[in-house]
């Protein structure tokens, strides 16, 4: 049975707090781009950009990023053909930009590592920061977020689910014991 950690209002407050932190730490919003890790990270990145626009009256570009080809923990059963890496998957130029990488949950760090590899194949940003709605710990790699909505200590046998209205039809963050 899933236990609700954040409801929709709490999620929105966490994203608003992250938005203010981004503005403060960057002393403005010049040269920023948001890159959301598919799937829910894209929707969260769009929300951050919208909130930034409301606060600073500036349109911040948002792009989705599919990291599936860069994962080191997903195995392809047919090794006879190398996957084709699409270096043009971002519809924005990240070279010399400050990229805010956005994801829903930070766990082992492997998704973020894959995203960093993908970003490096697509350009040379001046800086990359990481924003996550939930940091649940249990890192396998030396990766830490710059902006966190909520730290949720979890056990390894628990799963954190983030639901966003745009994709799931409702909003919440739940934790489930497996």
From Swiss-Prot:
CDD domains: PRTases_typeI (cd06223). It catalyses: UMP + diphosphate = 5-phospho-alpha-D-ribose 1-diphosphate + uracil. One of its GO terms (molecular function) is RNA binding. Keywords: Glycosyltransferase, RNA-binding, Transcription, Transcription regulation, Transcription termination, Transferase. InterPro entries: PRibTrfase_dom, PRTase-like, PyrR, PyrR_bifunctional. The keyword Transferase applies. It is an enzyme of class 2 (transferase). The keyword RNA-binding applies. GO terms for biological process: DNA-templated transcription termination. It comes from the Bacteria. Disulfide bonds: none annotated. A motif (PRPP-binding) lies at residues 99-111. Its EC number is 2.4.2.9. Belongs to the purine/pyrimidine phosphoribosyltransferase family. PyrR subfamily. Homodimer and homohexamer; in equilibrium. Regulates transcriptional attenuation of the pyrimidine nucleotide (pyr) operon by binding in a uridine-dependent manner to specific sites on pyr mRNA. This disrupts an antiterminator hairpin in the RNA and favors formation of a downstream transcription terminator, leading to a reduced expression of downstream genes. Also displays a weak uracil phosphoribosyltransferase activity which is not physiologically significant. This is Bifunctional protein PyrR. It comes from Limosilactobacillus reuteri subsp. reuteri (strain JCM 1112) (Lactobacillus reuteri). The gene is pyrR.
């Amino acid at each position: 049975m899933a236990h609700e950690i954040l409801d929709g209002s709490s999620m929105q407050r966490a994203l608003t707090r992250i938005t203010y932190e981004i503005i403060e730490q960057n002393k403005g919003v010049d040269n920023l781009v948001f890159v959301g890790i598919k799937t829910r990270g894209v929707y969260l990145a769009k929300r951050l950009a919208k909130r930034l626009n409301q606060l600073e009256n500036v349109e911040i570009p948002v792009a989705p990023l599919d990291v599936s080809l860069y994962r080191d923990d997903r195995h392809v059963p047919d090794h006879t053909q190398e996957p084709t890496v699409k270096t043009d998957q971002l519809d924005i130029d990240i070279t010399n930009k400050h990229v805010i990488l956005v994801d829903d949950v930070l766990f082992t760090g492997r998704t973020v590592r894959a995203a960093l590899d993908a970003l490096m194949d697509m350009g040379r940003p001046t800086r990359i920061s990481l924003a996550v709605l939930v940091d649940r710990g249990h890192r396998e790699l030396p990766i830490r977020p710059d902006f966190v909505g909520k730290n949720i200590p979890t056990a390894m046998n628990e799963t954190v689910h983030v639901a966003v209205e745009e994709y799931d039809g409702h909003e919440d963050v739940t934790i489930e014991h497996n």
